[in-house]
UniProtKB/Swiss-Prot annotation:
InterPro entries, sorted: 2Fe-2S_ferredoxin-like_sf (IPR036010), 2Fe-2S_ferredoxin-type (IPR001041), 2Fe2S_fd_BS (IPR006058), Beta-grasp_dom_sf (IPR012675), Fd_pln (IPR010241)
Domain 2Fe-2S ferredoxin-type: residue ranges: 55-145
Cofactor entry: [2Fe-2S] cluster
Transit peptide boundaries: 1-52
Name of the protein this chain belongs to: Ferredoxin-1, chloroplastic
Cysteines engaged in disulfide bonds, as pairs: none
Source organism superkingdom: Eukaryota
Record: residues binding [2Fe-2S] cluster: C91, C96, C99, C129
Gene Ontology biological process terms from the UniProt entry: electron transport chain; response to light stimulus
Annotated GO CC locations: chloroplast; chloroplast stroma
Length: 150
């Protein structure tokens, strides 16, 4: 009767009453390629790299209030779309005002956007296409005309 002795860090040995020999070396196994997302990493790999928080996000839309759960590594617009909530957008790159909203309470990280200036951010303006929640947050959506004065 043979028994395998070993640990993940040491080579395994097969032991029997008549011999002690090293186990064959493991062979490489090809794994399926992950789907690559924004920034060259898959969403699942980004989530595995660190602990993840999920925040309550309340969106005040012209049709009424909607609440959703948004992980801290997902843009608010992306999660809203995944949950079937229709929000305005255009460039999805943080370089226009189509998805503009106003933070009523809470906080977001929108350091990836390039459209809003520091004063607008301090006044509570947010681009939902490039905003991660950093706390529970309430946002008034559909605010492009108010932001641009159009």
């Amino acid at each position: 009767m043979a028994t395998v002795l070993g640990s993940p860090r040491a080579p395994a040995f097969f032991f029997s009453s008549s011999s002690l020999r090293a186990a064959p070396a493991p062979t490489a196994v090809a794994l399926p390629a992950a789907k690559v997302g924004i920034m060259g990493r898959s969403a699942s790999s980004r989530r595995r790299l660190r602990a993840q928080a999920t925040y309550n996000v309340k969106l005040i839309t012209p049709e009424g209030e909607v609440e959703l759960q948004v992980p801290d590594d997902v843009y608010i617009l992306d999660q809203a779309e995944e949950d079937g909530i229709d929000l305005p957008y255009s460039c999805r790159a943080g370089s226009c005002s189509s998805c503009a909203g106003k933070v009523v309470s809470g906080s977001v990280d929108q350091s990836d956007q390039s459209y809003l200036d520091d004063g607008q951010i301090a006044d509570g303006w947010v681009l939902t296409c490039h905003a991660y929640p950093t706390s529970d947050v309430v946002i008034e959506t559909h605010k492009e005309e108010e932001l641009t004065g159009a």
